Swiss-Prot record:
UniProt catalytic activity: Endonucleolytic cleavage to 5'-phosphomonoester
Keyword set, alphabetical order: Cytoplasm, Endonuclease, Hydrolase, Magnesium, Metal-binding, Nuclease
Gene giving rise to this polypeptide: rnhA
Organism: Rippkaea orientalis (strain PCC 8801 / RF-1)
EC number from the UniProt entry: 3.1.26.4
Domain RNase H type-1 stretches: 4-146
Protein name: Ribonuclease H
Cellular localization per UniProt: Cytoplasm
NCBIfam families found in the cross-reference section: PRK00203.1
Amino acid sequence: MNDSPKKVLIYTDGACSGNPGSGGYGTVLIYNNHRKELSGGFRLTTNNRMEMMAAIVGLETLTIKCAVTLYTDSRYLVDAITKGWAKKWKANGWKRNAKENAKNPDLWEKLLDLCSQHEVDFVWVKGHAGHQENEYCDRLAVRASQQTNLPSDEVYENKGIET
């Protein structure tokens, strides 16, 4: 019996019309011959929040522990996870340093929790450089950001957090 986790590829991208502005995320999950596409958006948000939401939504879709390779063109996302910044910010009460709060603590909290449930390898890809799945996720994200009646990114809009 093979107890090794299922290997899943997750491709992500975020988009924002203005920063802040209306934003969207696009996510593609691939497992064997199965493909799932997810997208959504918010009426007022930031590009970094949409990059993070794309990863969060992809990981939230998984129902069992998986070995995930997550592709993103967001250095912010990759560096904060792979260089341990997000864990450090959390340990410091969501402070980057003595004078500066970490941005997007609500989403980092979710992402760190999801990463603890899976084996996640974050891989940076250059955006708009012909990477097929990244380009597709970009189209999903842009399309989502252009929808009418987008919901509120309540934490961003109502709590006035820095992003």
